[in-house]
């Protein structure tokens, strides 16, 4: 996503004469020699603030833009919180951007955004028209389920305007080719053509020339039918070739596994989510567990159907029992809670800074007071196991629990 952000920022940075840089942890806290826009991942930010003594300020830092706050995890939260703490005496302005959430007030308070500067919109409030439809299934997660989903997926493609690009999200890389085969088979039977989804105005010679450039010739059977794939397991040159063909309209359908929804760099007139369950191996090869897609993943997939150039369609295929939950939050906005005490991120940070300078209990409480967790503990204490809305008391309890869990460096606290 950082590369996508850089691509989007490049034209604007050139207009204002600013240098655009994708920063690593070593250079992030240094003062730039010229007007600079720095793009950094949450993990890199936290690394930069964890591997050395925290600076009291960052010279020249005037604006921090936090994108995709709906994806706020413990690493993202702690990194931004520490950055807020060390810039509190500066005139640094924090701006947050997020998909629609059902209550953005605490997010705004966390970033010290004034109420007058807070803009909140419903998921339906967008300039671009987006049609959302859903279809439920009662077939268990299996090959039969995806064959059943191939029918409505094909019809959504077939009855859309000619040439409309299509993105299809499936649960795993292994499901990509079988889904493509099901779609091509449906296309051959229903449309009585051996060209699949290739537009009638595109010559076989042109497609053949592109197919000859594929390093993996097993992809030819799909690309020659207008279906491509995108995920890191595909050879980079083949991946870029298929992206290029997709952008030019030479192939119409791009199939993407769910884990790649964050990095797929294209949008489409039609986005289809074929299933919202995935299988994860637990505790060995013999134990498999079925999980549901997260709400943030689904929102990310839906966002690929929002285009500046025209209308979009979003088709959700899921199990019947999951539809109500997904529909509710797609309509009302995402719920937001802190994940900071559910993971080891906070413990790892304390251990890291302990190696560089003395840290006491109050220092940790001060750091926690700048977190989104502090806002939510005061607003929704029961979610975090507290009965009172006293922020200071609850944060002190969290630190005590943290010390007990860490044990080994507990003597560093007083």
What residues fall within each predicted segment?
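Conserved ATPase-coupling elements of RecA-like P-loop NTPase cores
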Residues: 2-6, 47-53, 68-79, 106-107, ...
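Conserved C-terminal RecA-like helicase domain
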Residues: 3-24, 173-248, 253, 289-299, ...
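Inter-Walker segment of RecA-like/P-loop motor cores
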Residues: 10-54, 120-125, 132-135, 212
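Conserved interdomain linker/interface between the two RecA-like ATPase lobes of SF2 helicase motors
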Residues: 27-30, 46, 92-187, 223, ...
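Loop/turn-to-beta-strand initiation segments
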Residues: 33-38, 43, 60-63, 89-95, ...
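SF2 helicase catalytic motif II
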Residues: 38, 42-46, 52-94
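Conserved segment of the helicase C-terminal RecA-like domain
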Residues: 93, 266, 270-281, 285-334
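C-terminal accessory/connector segments of nucleic-acid motor ATPases
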Residues: 235-245, 334-414
């Amino acid at each position: 996503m950082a590369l996508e952000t850089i691509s989007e920022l490049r034209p604007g940075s050139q207009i204002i004469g600013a240098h655009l840089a994708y920063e690593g942890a070593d250079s992030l806290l240094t003062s730039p020699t010229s007007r600079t826009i720095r793009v950094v991942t949450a993990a890199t930010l936290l690394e930069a603030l964890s591997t050395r003594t925290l600076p009291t300020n960052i010279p020249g830092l005037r604006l921090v833009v936090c994108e995709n706050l709906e994806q706020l995890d413990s690493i993202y939260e702690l990194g931004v919180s520490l950055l807020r703490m060390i810039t509190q005496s500066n005139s640094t302005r924090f701006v947050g951007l997020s998909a629609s959430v059902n209550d953005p007030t605490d997010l705004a308070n966390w970033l010290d955004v004034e109420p007058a500067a807070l803009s909140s919109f419903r998921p339906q409030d967008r300039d671009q028209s987006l049609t959302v439809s859903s279809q439920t299934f009662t077939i268990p997660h299996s090959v039969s389920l995806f064959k059943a989903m191939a029918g409505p997926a094909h019809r959504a493609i077939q009855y859309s305007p000619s040439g409309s690009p299509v993105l299809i999200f499936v649960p795993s890389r292994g499901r990509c080719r079988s889904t493509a085969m099901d779609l091509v088979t449906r296309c051959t039977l229903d449309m009585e053509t051996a060209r699949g989804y290739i537009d009638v105005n595109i010559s076989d010679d042109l497609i053949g020339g592109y197919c000859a450039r594929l390093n993996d010739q097993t992809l030819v059977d799909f690309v020659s039918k207008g279906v491509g794939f995108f995920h890191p397991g595909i050879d980079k040159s083949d991946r870029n070739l298929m992206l290029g063909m997709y952008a030019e309209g030479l192939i119409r359908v791009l199939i993407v596994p769910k884990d790649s929804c964050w990095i797929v760099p294209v949008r489409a007139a039609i986005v289809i989510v074929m299933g919202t369950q995935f299988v994860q191996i637990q505790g060995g090869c013999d134990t498999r567990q079925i999980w549901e897609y997260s709400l943030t993943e689904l929102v990310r997939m839906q966002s690929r159907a929002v285009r500046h150039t025209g209308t979009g369609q979003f088709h959700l295929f899921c199990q019947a029992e999951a539809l109500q939950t997904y529909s509710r939050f797609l309509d009302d906005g995402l719920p937001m809670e802190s994940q900071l005490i559910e993971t080891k991120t906070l413990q790892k940070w304390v251990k890291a800074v302990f190696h560089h300078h003395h840290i006491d209990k109050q220092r940790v409480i001060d750091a926690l007071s700048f977190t989104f967790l502090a806002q939510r503990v005061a607003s929704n204490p029961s979610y975090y196991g507290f009965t009172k809305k006293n922020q200071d008391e609850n944060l002190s309890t969290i630190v005590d629990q943290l010390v007990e869990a860490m044990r080994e460096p507990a003597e560093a606290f007083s």
